[in-house]
């Protein structure tokens, strides 16, 4: 990741543009996320607002924190719905890179942001592998088992950490401006 000026000066291939960021900290519990997802929703909403996300025009890809645990996944589903509204949340294509890579602790956020940029660039939503019996509380499009082609315009990557440290980065597909 570097400034546009620097990337253009050296002739680098540009995959996506960082257009938004949000963060929150709720200190709800040492390890458990807030059960209603309210603090995480603030980080997601901040990033989407800063990115000027328009649910009527943009096709959104969400790289969920998605740890595959009942507490995290239901809380994150609620957070997405609160941040975007139910209708827009149902249009989003969501996946968990962790289903492919496992949880890499400190490296996870960077790897998932790179995966999000590549998804935008190639127009491919990676699958959430192993998702055969979703939790009824996780009722959004979590792209189970199979990758999908899509003309994505915006991606967000959620990192929801211990102690309620929540971060969300928004990317926009690079159009070569």
Residue ranges and their predicted role:
Residues 1-53, 60-61, 176-177:
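Condensing-enzyme catalytic core mediating Claisen C-C bond formation in acyl metabolism
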Residues 43-53, 79, 83, 116, ...:
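Stable alpha-helical structural segments in soluble proteins, enriched in small hydrophobic residues
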